[in-house]
Swiss-Prot record:
It is an enzyme of class 4 (lyase). The gene is cya1. Residues 1-25 are annotated as: Disordered. It catalyses: ATP = 3',5'-cyclic AMP + diphosphate. Keywords: ATP-binding, cAMP biosynthesis, Cell membrane, Lyase, Magnesium, Membrane, Metal-binding, Nucleotide-binding, Transmembrane, Transmembrane helix. Plays essential roles in regulation of cellular metabolism by catalyzing the synthesis of a second messenger, cAMP. SMART domains: CYCc, HAMP. The chain crosses the membrane at residues 33-53, 373-393. This is Adenylate cyclase 1. One of its GO terms (cellular component) is plasma membrane. Mg(2+) binds at residues 476, 520. It comes from Rhizobium meliloti (strain 1021) (Ensifer meliloti). Its cofactor is Mg(2+). The keyword Membrane applies.
Length: 665
């Protein structure tokens, strides 16, 4: 019974897929290999499971430890920022909350102003300077001269510890800058006047952000104009006059030093991103220099585009407070992102800590390598033991191997009778006997070569058929009836046997399969049961090769006084129903359908055209670049309503060797 699908028959691809799932008999060919494979597989599974579990534990522990360290790192950074913020904002708030000398612009009550700010700077070494901006444009600034940049900018005399800058007006109302230099004890020992540089505190971001407000605000980070250091400003309006703004510059060197010093691994990095994802502080000194070089005073930094990690985090921000794996190039990083909210400085920014996963897992990987080495040694020992054990029980295996080789040659005369106390060998013996019986059954109704190809392709599975594109070739001997009438049956059989031997050799050499010998006719087919992408070409080449061989055959016939066998060929390509049909006890592998009928009709049409090899347009369409054809027009084959394009096969475009002619079965 044909197995039907939506198109009527099972598709050839589905048949091949189902047969691909069947276990290969090569597993039964070597007990030694099978025994060794089973033992090795068991040991590998057990060892891999144990090593894998140990590695997973070590990996999880390493990642968990890294996450804890990252959280602790972020906590310490927040504490440092909190200390800087608290210390600075406390000084600014103190000055802004008391109705004191800062309510009047310089030069009034200069000593009181200097005393307060000098004391504040002395207590806060991270403060670069403290200043006051007035609504009139007056400005008062106390600078710590521990900074070499400030000493150079102000040309400070030796022994100066504090510089006091003030913007005042002379008697004519013209602005000028006064700079006072104080020693470490607070005594003034030098004074210098300079023309005003046009600085107006009222235009500065720190003044505009705090004026008329109540709470302290933070500005930056930015590169300080004089020192070039990374800094921020905390400013607040004076409570006595909200148009007077007190500001303090905070140097963030302690933060940058902390980031560069506190590293989880050699290549781990940490950096701070602003609200729009631009880096402002980085633990890597090279990256920090690029960041500093790309920004100006009071202006945020531009992102260095060549840093893949920063760009990846900007494009796909990881969730805050949760460690995430981030792929950058061919390296994976464990990344933690935490918002900075508890401190005034850098509030609204994010700190990012990233460590290469391979460095975090270095210890776990070392443990894995050690485990694999031990497991490998165990496997090697087990393989040796398995080989020794298999050698003791493989006496019968060689006999089974010989029997398998005989089956491969379709030798069914020698029985397979191997006895063994090993269950696997006994099972294999039974399986081979069943295989022998199955192949022998096939040999009852199809030639051995067809059986061999059918078994190799997996198409012999009982009564089944499917649609398959094939190239069919039919042949017939001209005037064979007359030849038979003039010869004895023995002579006819002898001539036909030699003739069919010739056909079998040439068809097999061109990857074809002889489906049937019917009288003096031959029905051969390509692309079934073995797939052949060049089936049409191979069929044409086969017909030409048979004609060439027949010349020698007929010469021998003439020399022996026997008749020549003039053979006609018909070749057609198309879809046919291919499979095994018949009764349960007698199956026949064949092809049916219009394709087969057309090939048979083409063979007969040679008489009308005076040709020997005719092919259809479907054949020409597939191999016109490899085979030479002569068009003969169109004609209707018997039993068909539509006309066919008829061509004579006259030769090949180029000669090919046997390998080019097709793939051996």
């Amino acid at each position: 019974m044909l197995q039907r699908s939506e198109s009527g028959f099972k598709d050839i691809e589905s048949m091949q897929d189902s047969n691909a799932d069947k276990p290969s008999r090569t597993w039964t060919s070597s007990l030694r290999s099978l025994l060794g494979l089973v033992m090795v597989a068991m040991l590998i599974v057990v060892s891999a499971t144990l090593v894998g579990l140990d590695y997973r534990r070590a990996r999880s522990a390493a990642i968990a430890g890294a996450e804890d360290n990252m959280d602790a790192f972020v906590g310490r950074l927040v504490d440092r920022l909190g200390a800087l913020s608290g210390d600075t904002s406390a000084l600014v708030s103190l000055v802004a909350s008391v109705a004191n000398s800062f309510l009047v612009p310089p030069p009034e009550r200069m000593n009181d102003k200097v005393a307060v700010l000098r004391e504040g700077i002395a207590r806060s070494p991270h403060i670069d300077g403290v200043y006051v901006g007035y609504p009139s444009g007056a400005f008062f600034h106390v600078v710590d001269l521990d900074s070499a940049a400030w000493r150079m900018a102000l040309d400070a005399p030796r022994g100066a510890a504090i510089a006091v800058r003030s913007m005042e007006r002379n008697d004519q109302g013209k602005p000028f800058d006064r700079i006072l230099f104080l020693d470490a004890s607070g005594l003034q020992f030098a004074e210098r006047h300079a023309a005003s540089n046009g600085f107006d505190p009222r235009t500065r971001p720190w003044y505009r952000a705090a004026v008329n407000g109540k709470a302290p605000v933070a500005i930056g980070p930015y590169e300080m104009a004089t020192t070039g250091n990374l800094g921020m400003t905390i400013s607040q309006a004076h409570r006595g006059n909200p148009q007077i703004v007190i500001g303090a510059d905070v140097v963030l060197d302690t933060i940058t030093d902390f980031l560069s010093r506190e590293r989880l691994t050699d290549d781990s990095v940490s950096f701070v991103l602003d609200a729009v994802g631009r880096p402002i502080i980085h633990s890597d000194s090279t990256m920090m220099r690029r960041i500093m070089a790309s920004k100006g005073r009071d202006r945020p930094v531009a992102t260095p585009q060549e840093d893949g990690l920063i760009e990846s985090i900007r494009r796909n921000p990881p969730p805050a407070g949760k460690a995430t794996l981030v792929e950058v190039g061919n390296r994976t990083y464990l990344v933690t992102v935490a918002p900075l909210e508890s401190a005034l400085l850098l509030s609204g920014h994010r700190v990012v800590v990233a460590a290469p996963l391979d460095e975090l897992l270095a210890a776990a990987n070392e443990t894995l390598v050690q485990g694999l080495a031990v497991s490998g040694a165990v496997v090697v020992v087990a393989v040796l033991l398995a080989l020794v054990l298999a050698h003791l029980i493989t006496k019968s295996l060689n006999q089974l191997t010989d029997s398998a080789n005989r089956l491969q040659d379709l030798d069914f005369a020698t029985p397979i009778d191997v006895s063994s106390h090993v269950a696997e060998i006994s099972t294999l013996n039974g399986a081979m006997n069943r295989a022998r019986d199955a192949i022998f059954t096939f040999a009852l109704y199809v030639p051995k070569e067809l059986v061999r190809k059918g078994i190799e392709s997996g198409h012999f599975g009982g009564r089944a058929a499917w649609r398959q594109e094939v190239t069919a070739m039919f042949t017939d001997i001209y005037d064979f009836t007359t030849i038979s009438e003039g010869r004895s049956p023995e002579e006819v059989v002898a001539m036909l046997s030699e003739y069919f031997d010739l056909f079998s050799e040439v068809v097999a050499a061109h990857d074809g399969t002889i489906i049937q010998f019917h009288g003096d006719s031959v029905f051969a087919m390509w692309n079934a049961p073995v797939a052949d992408t060049r089936h049409a070409e191979h069929a044409c080449r086969c017909a030409l090769a048979v004609e060439e061989r027949l010349e020698a055959f007929n010469s021998a016939q003439r020399a022996s006084g026997l008749p020549e066998f003039r053979t006609r060929f018909g070749i057609h390509t198309g879809t046919a129903v291919v499979g095994s049909v018949g009764a349960k006890e007698r199956l026949q592998y064949t092809a049916m359908g219009d394709t087969v009928n057309v090939a048979s009709r083409l063979e007969g049409m040679n008489k009308d055209y005076g040709t020997s090899v005719l092919a259809s347009g479907a054949v020409v369409a597939q191999c016109k670049d490899m085979v030479k054809f002569r068009p003969l027009g169109t004609a209707k084959a018997k039993g068909r309503s539509t006309a066919l394009d008829i061509y004579e096969v006259v030769g090949v475009v180029r000669a090919v060797n046997t390998t080019e002619a097709g793939t051996a079965a």
